[in-house]
């Protein structure tokens, strides 16, 4: 039997000295509660050690260019293969990265266009062909014996002027005749051309009669004409037509030259191909007037101009005062009071000079005569000239990304877009959905020579497109920017890229690849994972999805609890072996001993509804959607069907603009009816709760403020005069100044990875010695930050305010996180649950709309059960909950389902079904209904077995 991967003494993070042997060339799933230690074992131990050993095998010179991972806390690992990690945190933040560049399909497209494209004039649209001298000579001989020709070299094409200097130079060079505007002249004669008219001048190189033995002379004449005409020449048949030839890519009609089609001119990341206006980004930041003045009824004096609060002495308002005076208006007017001409000038700027005085920062007052700049160009200029990050960030809220006005989002120069394959340029190909590209390339009509060149390129493109389809990304376009992809989409793109590499004998480690996938797409993903395994690879998948766990060859269940209560192997083996272990929560859910029950009855709501009319943003097909208030609604549908567009971009942003006077971008919809029935809108997304390690769950929820207040009330703190600020690690006073309250110091190592060592002064405690001398129940402030939520609950049992917040964090499944855990180390799901807990801590007013996008991300079935209790409780209190979700355990307990589809991308964007889960199951063309029906039936069966038929 082949030796597996042997792990001995794994103690990384919360792991409890794990000893484990994993089989090779199998699909292995690590399961367990959130925070049980799955990622610690998979990524922080197995992958880290595999990567470290690989980098260590390289030379010291090579190592300095590679990030090296720290050695995990482990005795040893044997039998490791080269390891590749495909997680969700490695998403590109580069606006130049697209689906096409990440998957390398764009590189193959560039090669295809360089070798098998056809050129068309960007001005007149006529085909452009490049010909060699031999090809031109052969074409002329084919005109037939006794054909009389004039070989002409064009020296001026549609150019104004008398061209006297040009004609004189031609005389000096010994040329005898020219053709000007189709009239033949001798250069010895005086040629008069009108100065203000466009003229075309061609030099007569030779006059030839086609006959046997003429090829040598014809070749010399053609070469001379091409040289004089800069790659262009004309063969004029006497008493017949002109034949235009080009040795370059140049239009014979317009004279427009195109560059040689090489791969670099089709790259928007190369100056030879990138649109010069947007530098290949395809978009530019422009000031948005709707954000600058969201309410056009408010006067300028009361702050109508949001980016620039009213101050009569500033440069803007001195100008504006003079501008309004010209229209006999004052600062007490609003934008809507302006005449139409003034509105245009206010937005874009005027031509009339305004007289106004301005006192600068040195106290000097000067008189100025300037035209009003216009609020839109001024906002853009101030953003570009901002000298602090904070100012730039503030002004960025009033800018939106718009397609480049020159390339219209194509990213490339017009010359690059002149080349076509299958009558489409490379930008048009990139804008097609992956599902449409596959048949396009399969049915591509190429000439025989082009087929030979393109065969291998098309094979690679076909494979990569197929892999994208197999991981459920058929709705994406190659031009989609990588920064706009969700974590799950980005991970599956990297997965598709790895499949394309065809590597064998590799250890792949994946982090919840099923996130964001509809059950139908999940089936394709599982087939892909099995295909990678069958190639001869080992796959370790950290996953909560039941179908993935059931499909595994080997399951390792980590637990039994989270945090300090986890870190042990509760069960390992096949599905049947894990189901037999009573201590395994995963096994019990798989077996059916534990399950999430159906609600006793479905709510019908409070009689009111939110109605979205005419939603047509992105791929939405002008749909009307009703969302019942006072109910738990779930929006379902395949990846790319329009769920996030409908709920996040239209419902949340549109409702927020109505209720809170925010200035989100104007998504395409007609109206939202029923906004008056909602008091508050809360969007609980998966964006980080902070961008720095100083942010944590305790600071975000204000829990830390209460804890600092408690420490300041101790007798020792009172005696020393310490206020709550003394116990903050963000400000001077109580923090350790050696590490500025970080607790660690980074040491840069040239040949090794950067090393983070505990601060020598505070030894990682973050505070100075005097602050740490203050204790509450024997613990100092640093000790408290190192506690998990579960540990802190009994510690603060006598403080209701702190206890209530801690219990809320525990209820949302975050009992395992440390109070001081940096926000930068939290997953999107953890950040979302911190936000949910923060909202739950606030006083409930009822009539609140809660929006959550895939809240089950990273959650075990047991955690989902707890989360659903909280969400149902919110609805019971008179609120409305709208959730975007694929997890069928959540979908089955909804009061209402809005199912979008039927598929993703252009094939989605319609309401497939609406109603209760039972009603959705009856809709035959609903993919959600097809997968939901057996889940509801199984749950009913389990409820009947456990509780009898109610």
Please identify what each model-predicted range represents.
Residues 1-950:
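Conserved phosphate-binding elements of NTP-dependent enzyme cores
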């Amino acid at each position: 039997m082949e030796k597996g991967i042997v792990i001995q003494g794994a103690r990384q993070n919360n792991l409890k000295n794990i000893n484990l042997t994993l089989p090779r060339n199998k699909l292995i799933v690590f399961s367990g509660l959130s925070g049980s230690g799955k990622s610690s074992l998979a990524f922080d131990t197995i992958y880290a050690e595999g990567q470290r050993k690989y980098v260590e095998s390289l030379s010291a010179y090579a190592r300095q260019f590679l990030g090296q991972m720290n050695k995990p806390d482990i005795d040893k690992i044997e039998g490791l293969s080269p390891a590749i990690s495909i997680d969700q945190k490695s998403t590109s933040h580069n606006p130049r990265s697209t689906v096409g560049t990440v998957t390398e399909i764009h590189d193959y497209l560039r090669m295809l266009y360089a070798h098998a494209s056809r050129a068309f004039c960007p001005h007149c649209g006529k085909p452009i062909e490049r010909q060699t001298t031999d090809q031109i000579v052969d074409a002329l001989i084919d005109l037939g014996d006794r054909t009389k020709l004039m070989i002409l070299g064009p020296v001026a094409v549609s150019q104004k002027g008398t061209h006297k200097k040009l004609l004189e130079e031609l005389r000096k060079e010994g040329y005898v005749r020219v053709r000007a505007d189709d009239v033949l002249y001798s250069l010895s004669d005086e040629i008069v051309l009108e100065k203000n008219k466009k003229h075309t001048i061609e030099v007569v190189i030779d006059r030839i009669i086609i006959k046997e033995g003429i090829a040598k002379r014809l070749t010399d004449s053609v070469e001379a004409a091409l040289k004089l005409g800069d790659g262009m020449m004309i063969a004029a048949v006497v008493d017949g037509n002109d034949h235009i030839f080009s040795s370059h890519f140049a239009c014979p009609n317009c004279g427009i030259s195109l560059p040689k089609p090489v791969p670099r001119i089709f790259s928007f990341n190369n100056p030879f191909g990138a649109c010069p206006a947007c530098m290949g980004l395809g978009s530019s930041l422009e000031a948005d007037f709707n954000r600058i003045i969201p309410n056009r009824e408010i006067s300028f004096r009361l702050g109508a101009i949001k980016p620039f609060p009213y101050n009569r002495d500033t440069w803007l308002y001195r100008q504006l005062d003079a501008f309004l005076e010209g229209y006999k208006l004052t600062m007490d007017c609003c934008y809507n009071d302006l005449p139409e001409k003034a509105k245009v000038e206010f937005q874009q700027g005027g031509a009339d000079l305004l007289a106004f005085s301005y006192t600068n920062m040195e106290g000097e007052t000067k008189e100025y005569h300037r035209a009003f700049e216009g609020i839109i160009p001024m906002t853009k200029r101030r953003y570009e000239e901002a000298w602090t990050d904070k100012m730039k960030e503030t002004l960025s809220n009033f800018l939106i990304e718009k397609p480049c006005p020159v390339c219209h989002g194509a990213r490339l120069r017009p010359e690059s877009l002149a080349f076509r394959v299958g009558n489409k340029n490379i930008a048009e190909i990139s804008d097609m959905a992956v599902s449409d590209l596959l048949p396009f390339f399969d049915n591509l009509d190429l000439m025989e020579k082009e087929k030979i060149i393109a065969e291998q390129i098309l094979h690679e493109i076909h494979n990569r497109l197929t892999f994208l389809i197999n991981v459920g990304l058929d709705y994406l376009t190659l031009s989609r920017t990588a920064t706009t992809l969700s974590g799950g989409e980005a991970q599956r793109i990297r997965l598709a890229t790895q499949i394309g590499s065809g590597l064998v004998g590799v250890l792949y480690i994946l982090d919840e690849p099923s996130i964001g996938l509809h059950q139908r797409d999940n089936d394709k993903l599982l087939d892909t994972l099995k295909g990678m395994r069958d190639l001869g690879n080992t796959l370790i998948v950290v996953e909560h999805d039941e179908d993935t766990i059931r499909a595994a060859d080997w399951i390792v269940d980590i637990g039994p609890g989270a945090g300090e209560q986890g870190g042990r192997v509760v069960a390992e083996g096949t599905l049947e072996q894990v189901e037999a272990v009573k201590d395994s929560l995963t096994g019990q859910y798989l077996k059916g001993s534990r399950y999430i029950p159906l609600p006793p009855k479905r709510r019908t709501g409070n009689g009111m509804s939110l109605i979205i009319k005419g939603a047509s943003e992105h791929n939405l097909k002008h749909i009307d959607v009703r969302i019942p208030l006072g109910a738990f609604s779930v929006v379902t549908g395949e990846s790319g069907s329009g769920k996030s567009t409908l709920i996040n971009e239209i419902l949340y942003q549109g409702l927020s603009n109505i209720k809170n006077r925010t200035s989100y971008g104007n998504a395409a919809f007609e109206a939202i009816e029923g906004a008056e029935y909602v008091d508050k809108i809360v969007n609980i997304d998966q964006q980080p709760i902070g961008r720095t390690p100083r942010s944590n769950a305790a600071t975000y929820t204000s829990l830390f403020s209460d804890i600092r207040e408690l420490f300041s009330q101790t007798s020792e703190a009172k005696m020393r005069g310490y206020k709550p600020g003394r116990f903050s690690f963000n400000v001077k006073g109580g923090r350790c100044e050696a590490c500025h309250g970080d607790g660690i110091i980074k040491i840069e190592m040239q040949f090794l990875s950067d090393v983070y060592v505990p601060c020598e002064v505070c030894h990682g405690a973050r505070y100075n010695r005097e602050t740490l001398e203050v204790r509450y129940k024997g613990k100092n402030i640093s000790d408290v930050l190192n506690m998990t939520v579960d540990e802190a609950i009994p510690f603060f049992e006598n403080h209701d305010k702190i206890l209530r917040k801690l219990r809320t964090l525990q209820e949302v499944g975050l009992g395992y996180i440390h109070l001081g855990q940096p926000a930068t180390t939290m997953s999107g799901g953890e950040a979302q649950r911190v936000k949910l807990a923060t909202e739950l801590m606030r006083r409930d007013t009822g009539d609140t709309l809660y929006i959550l996008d895939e809240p089950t991300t990273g959650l075990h079935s047991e955690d989902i059960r707890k989360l659903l209790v909280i969400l149902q409780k919110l609805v019971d209190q008179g609120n409305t909950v709208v959730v975007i979700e694929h997890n069928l355990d959540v979908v089955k307990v909804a009061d209402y389902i809005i199912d979008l589809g039927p598929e993703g991308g252009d094939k989605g964007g319609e309401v497939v079904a609406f109603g209760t889960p039972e009603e959705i199951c009856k809709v035959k063309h609903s993919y959600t209904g097809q997968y939901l029906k057996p889940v509801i039936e199984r749950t009913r069966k389990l409820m009947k077995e456990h509780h009898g038929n109610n």
